[in-house]
Amino acid sequence: MKEILDAIQSQDSTAADFAALSIPESYRAVTVHKDETEMFAGLTTRDKDPRKSLHLDEVPVPELGPGEALVAVMASSVNYNSVWTSIFEPMSTFGFLERYGKLSELTKRHDLPYHVIGSDLAGVVLRTGPGVNAWHPGDEVVAHCLSVELESSDGHNDTMLDPEQRIWGFETNFGGLAEIALVKSNQLMPKPQHLSWEEAAAPGLVNSTAYRQLVSRNGAGMKQGDNVLIWGASGGLGSYATQFALAGGANPICVVSSDQKADICRKMGAEAIIDRNAEGYRFWKDEHNQDPREWKRFGKRIRELTGGEDVDIVFEHPGRETFGASVYVTRKGGTIVTCASTSGYNHEYDNRYLWMSLKKIVGSHFANYREAWEANRLVAKGKIHPTLSKVYSLEETGQAAYDVHRNLHQGKVGVLALAPREGLGVRDEELRERHIDAINLFRDAPAERTSRHSGNV
């Protein structure tokens, strides 16, 4: 790995130099183990601890196939799908790997007793397989996480509709929380030149997801002047939705859970903010019954912030806890666009408020290549900024995942892989200087209370 890192850090390395590098037989990777999928049996979701299930293992470098690339990973980040993988909820990801392994002789590589996780990366191309023409060894890249086969016609208008669509590092193996990653070449995009490795790795999954969900015609199709209710507006996903709303001329109504998260939203430029804890919203009376009076109180508060208007779009991702309220507060003809369901997948709402008011529920999942490319282009132009708040080493990935699981983080949590320290990889100092305050906004925010314990990673 030292040879690879030296080449990346050298100012003089050429594509030929990278092509001449020998690929190691093995690399370090963050994994979960197939024989441990029942380790949290009987525990509540909250009590399942990623620090116990995530391992840092030495694993063999996978075979490189047609249309693929091996990438030296300088940095990655933690998403909720890595948390779900680590706690084996809502199911073990080894079922995904088994099914993928049955697709072809080549995909058998993915069906292993360990799963290398992670759906973000920033790094450098080391090798490309047959049929790859757009990317070459030495290219500095980021990767989006959509893996598709595109052998069916279904995916050719929108690749997210490909029957063999999968999320890399979640439903496939050889993900980005590692020193080397295996990706399809059509996952690659240019690394934003003004960002460090860890900053460039942070937007990836959540930035592309927010773009499709809120901006794209495949999602809510936000337009200028729209009132957009954003749950978790300072979090990993919501922070990008807030930025897209502001950049696109919409009016974000940011829902947060603390004063410091409200302050982050203000610093991003938002004016309408609801601290749901401070204002005491409790949308459920008990485990089985929601409280419509709280929906009405919430809707009244929104109208106070918008000059009497209801919201055109609700950016939904908490799921069960908030979905009834989301449907209620949306204006007639408005859109609830939903993904993830981090508080529970079984949504309940009063259908009278949907059907009689002609509202729409739109499901949104990640992004196609074009949407991911456009989202990354906005980052590269300095229009949208990373929301990186904290960076861990590869050895500390378990703690990073724990912090995300317990909501002890702001924005995105980064992980250094091959990068020996933070701040490396910046190529455009002038653009960086123009946007340095926005780039560091989440880094400067005070950390939530956290508790560190020993673990495997």
Residue map of PLM features:
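C-terminal hydrophobic helical "lid"/dimerization subdomain
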Residues: K2-S22, G324-V327, Y369-V457
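Hydrophobic/small residue at the entry helix of a nucleotide-binding pocket
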Residues: T209, G236-L237, E321-T322
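A short N-terminal beta-strand-loop micro-motif at the entrance of redox/enzyme domains
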Residues: I4-S22, T37-A75, Y114-V116, G131-V132
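Helix-to-beta-strand junctions that scaffold the AdoMet/dcAdoMet cofactor pocket
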Residues: K223, T330-R331
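Glycine-rich beta-strand-centered segment in the early N-terminal region that forms part
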Residues: P60-S77, M91-S152
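Rossmann-fold NAD(P)-binding glycine/threonine-rich loop
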Residues: S341-M356
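NAD(P)H dinucleotide-binding glycine-rich loop of Rossmann-like/cofactor-binding domains
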Residues: T107-P113, S119, L146-G232
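Adenosine-nucleotide cofactor-binding segment
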Residues: I230, L246-E321
